[in-house]
Amino acid sequence: MKKMTNDDVYTADSLREIAANQITEDNFPLIIESYRLEADSFDFNGNWEPSEITSIEDLRTELIIPGNNFWGDIIVLQLLQQALKINFIIFRSDSPKLYPTATENEDYELSIILYYENNIHFKLVGIFQSNNLYTVQKTKKLPKFIGDIIKEDTNNY
C-alpha cells in the first residue's frame, strides 16, 4: 500500500476495507482471541459475536459491514497504522493524557491525531494553519505543545 498523504481522502468504508485486508493468518488468532476475551468480560462494543468467528474471512466480513456493527478500536487503528504507514497519536479525555498504544515509537513521516472521548469514541483532530484544517501532520513538525505532552506522558519524542 502506498504511503498516505494530506491529499488522500478515505471514507469510513475504505478505511474498514483497508483494515480488514491487514488481517492475516499470523495476526488473526491474537485479534479474535482479544475480541472473545472482551466479550467474555462484557467489555465488547460490537453487534456481532466473536465466538462465532471461525476464519479470517468471517472477521473481515464483520469489519467491513457499515454502521455500528463493528466499532473502531485500538486493534483496527494498529491495522490501519501498519497499512497506511502513519502514526496515530491518541489523546484521552481522562488521565494519562495519551492513550497507551505502544506505537508512539513508530518512525512514520506522518501522524494523525485522535481524541478518545469517554473511553468509547474516537474523534479526528485537526490543526488550523492559514485558515485550513489539516488532519494529517508531519510527525517531525507537530506543534511543540503536542511534543511536550508526548514527552511528558511517554518519556519519548
Question: What is the predicted function of each stretch?
Answer:
Residues 2-99:
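Papain-like cysteine protease catalytic cores
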